[in-house]
């Protein structure tokens, strides 16, 4: 076990005094790291995630290289879907492709339930390896939100308009709600197993939920999100972060959920979120594209985010989306260092 652990992010969420604003980056594990790219010449994403030693190495890299205040487990939101009967393939340049999309309630009924110890032991073994031996910062486990997972399962892959997904919601509520309930059950078991293995925070990625309006979110999504988070928290008092893209119109709905941290994309400032009545710890939210700019521009954009975060009092610095592969590792290191220095108290 690691002594003198850096628990800054957990202290921030609890409202305790911290020495600086904690920082981590979505997609910090992999992508822009040369060590990771070298591994990808030999191994696929699923190859790496199925080998705990390799997966732990990739997960740990950004903590060593960028001095982040948290690690996030290297895996894909599709990980729990394969074991329940979803024929998913990760295609380069496309993303997840589902070869047996959900169309009817019979398709939902064919899905099995997940047994994490049996179906994803490599995920749990990676977490145990990290938390028992090496990691000196909290580990973030994660899952895709039911809507985002369902959208892939129904559309058959990434989508711009989510027409098939919305059509199912509007035309066939029985199938939609059956799928939502099944995915909540899967997610609760999957997340709970991660926490029991040693994850100290959970992030729920609802990447595509911004495609819905408020009325549809309330009717078709919100009750299932409440059940997912509540059932996890009934088992373990673990902080939960929720993040989505292009979903500022849903901020008040998210603030109602039993989450601890609300992740902002780059379109909504911390001050705007406060003005909308958000009471949660806020996470974010530098536009990841800014990391491709010269350092003076990056620093200029960092300061107002950090100033607003310090004024708010409960802020975790992150990007407003994931790290782009083109971002230089040195840039991420400098951002992390700047956040720590600028917010030092």
Curated annotation (Swiss-Prot):
| CDD domains noted in UniProt | URO-D (cd00717)
Q: Which residues form a coiled coil?
A: none
One GO molecular-function annotation for this sequence? uroporphyrinogen decarboxylase activity
The residues listed in the UniProt record as binding substrate, with positions renumbered to this chain, are: 27-31, 46, 76, 152, 207, 321
Gene Ontology CC entries for this record: cytosol
Q: Which chain positions carry the site (Transition state stabilizer)?
A: 76
GO annotations under biological process? heme biosynthetic process; protoporphyrinogen IX biosynthetic process
The places in or outside the cell where this protein is found are: Cytoplasm
What InterPro entries does the entry give? Answer: UROD/MetE-like_sf (IPR038071), Uroporphyrinogen_deCO2ase_HemE (IPR006361), Uroporphyrinogen_deCOase (IPR000257)
Q: What UniProt keywords apply to this chain's record, in alphabetical order? A: Cytoplasm, Decarboxylase, Lyase, Porphyrin biosynthesis
Keyword Cytoplasm among record annotations: yes
Endoplasmic reticulum listed as a keyword: no
Its Enzyme Commission number(s) read: 4.1.1.37
Q: List the disulfide bonds.
A: none
The record, for Gene3D superfamilies, names: 3.20.20.210
Pathway assignment reads: Porphyrin-containing compound metabolism; protoporphyrin-IX biosynthesis; coproporphyrinogen-III from 5-aminolevulinate: step 4/4
- Which EC class, in a word? lyase
Instruction: Cite the PANTHER family for this sequence.
Output: METHYLTETRAHYDROFOLATE:HOMOCYSTEINE METHYLTRANSFERASE RELATED, UROPORPHYRINOGEN DECARBOXYLASE
Q: What does the record give as the function of this protein?
A: Catalyzes the decarboxylation of four acetate groups of uroporphyrinogen-III to yield coproporphyrinogen-III.
Family, according to the entry, reads as follows:
Belongs to the uroporphyrinogen decarboxylase family.
- Read off the HAMAP family from this record: URO_D
Record note on quaternary structure: Homodimer.
Q: What is this protein called?
A: Uroporphyrinogen decarboxylase
Q: Which organism is it from?
A: Staphylococcus aureus (strain NCTC 8325 / PS 47)
